[in-house]
Amino acid sequence: QKLIEALEEENIFRKLANVIQTSSGDRKIPVVATKGTASWVDEEGIIPESDDSFSQVSIGAYKLATMIKVSEELLNDSVFNLENYIAKEFGRRIGNKEEEAFIIGDGTGKPTGIFNATGGAEDGTSTTGTTSATSITFDEIMDLYYSLKSPYRKNASFIMNDSTVKAIRKLKDGNGNYLWQPSMTAGTPDTILNCPVYTSTYIPNIAAGNKTVVFGDYSYYWIADRQGRSFKRLNELYAVTGQVGFVATQRVDGKLILPEAVKYLQQKA
């Protein structure tokens, strides 16, 4: 339980995405590929067929693990709860690695990130990216915002890294009003256009061709936790060296099941 709590603290995606539990095998998630429409029909007229078409997204499981060895003396003499610290440290390690994969993972031996060319978010800027390779304008953030369909904007938020935050905090509209609005309540995120802003070190910096800001409803990113997450203490394996090992393992996958629900801003190449 301590490991799970630490993971949620360290990985922002676990707070924003849809987290499910799976037992075995791949999980098939049905997704609407195209939607039908209604039609105006004459009295006694034939109602035209207009079916939705469906596709599937398959979510599996990839193994993520970490280990640490501690001397028996340190474990016995420690003035604080060392096992509690180790659980939190494992949460930091695994949580950071998860977050990295959920953003830039290529789907090979790890989850598929929202920035991956295949199965990732859609481009919310022009085909050539922003007007500059080294900056972002007020209008480009506005374009990104409105590139996302209205139903998704209701639960949408921005994610970027700290250096991009620094640049965007300086943007003003034509009347001198800042685009960025700081939070007035402790524990709640700042906002852009009334949408929360979160930061991640794994979002690329502002540079030519980089995807630097992502905006969308991340509940359409599904994280599948395979049952069997473990946190083990190994008393015997390193006994000859006077050490105790601690191992944490988990199996997890993540995929964006509806790409149109998340958009990214890309710098000019």
Residue ranges and their predicted role:
Residues 1-155, 169, 177-180, 184-191, ...:
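Acidic/polar, low-complexity extended loops/arms that serve as protein-protein interfaces
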Residues 235-269:
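Extended, compositionally biased alpha-helical segments that mediate assembly or anchoring
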Residues 168, 206-208, 222-224, 240, ...:
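Short active-site-adjacent structural elements
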Residues 43-48, 82-85, 174-175, 212-214, ...:
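Short intrinsically disordered coil segments
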Residues 154, 193, 227, 242-244:
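A short pocket-lining beta-strand/turn micro-motif at the edge of beta-sheets
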Residues 191-236:
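C-terminal hydrophobic structural anchor segments
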Residues 153-163:
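C-terminal amphipathic alpha-helical segment
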Residues 161, 197, 246:
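Hydrophobic, well-ordered secondary-structure elements that form the walls
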